[in-house]
Amino acid sequence: ESSAASDVYKRQAIKQASIVIMQLETPIESVTYAAKMAKKDGITVILNPAPAPTQQLPDDLLANVDILIPNVTEAEIISGMHITDDESAKEAIRYISSKGIKTVIITMGAKGALAYENNEFTHIPAFKVEAVDTTAAGDTFCGGLCVALSEGKNLKDAIIFASKASSISVTRMGAQVSIPLRKEIQ
């Protein structure tokens, strides 16, 4: 297949979406390319920078991301700052946001999530559960957030929905099998 035909196909696939979510198990060049295409078409771009990057993420990638969802370790790598408390987390978020990202959500496990949007911070506490396996916690959170946002929920309500989904997943062993069904999250 020619490169031009391939580009048209990829662009059509992305244009059908309202949200594009990516992570870093795909080559960074591909992630950057997809983010640029989606952003150009006005599609919300969400990046979960996992697995944790081994180097700084390219500015041309970050400039095309609308929502970044790192965990604490990933936020430390991206910002170059050590996160020890809420204040250092906020400082790291401000730095990350300065790269052109309008919304940053740091997931903090049992401490909940800290979100930054429109120059405002919102802390969403975690649901209290007995965690047995955190393997799919981050992926479940990101998937839940995408579902809620695609259904028109505001950021705070979307994070609460994502947190519920993630809280359920950590009470079960395994990865995919731990992800809750929609009816379990309501």
Feature locations, PLM:
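Conserved phosphate-binding/catalytic region of the ribokinase-like
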Residues: 40, 54-55, 59, 63, ...
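Single conserved hydrophobic/aromatic residue that forms the stacking wall/gate
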Residues: 1-5, 9
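Conserved sugar-transfer catalytic core signal across GT-A, GT-B, and GT-C glycosyltransferases
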Residues: 4, 34, 130
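Conserved beta-alpha-beta core of the PfkB/ribokinase-like small-molecule kinase fold
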Residues: 12, 18-91, 112-113
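Generic structural signal for beta-strand residues in well-ordered domains
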Residues: 1, 13-14, 106
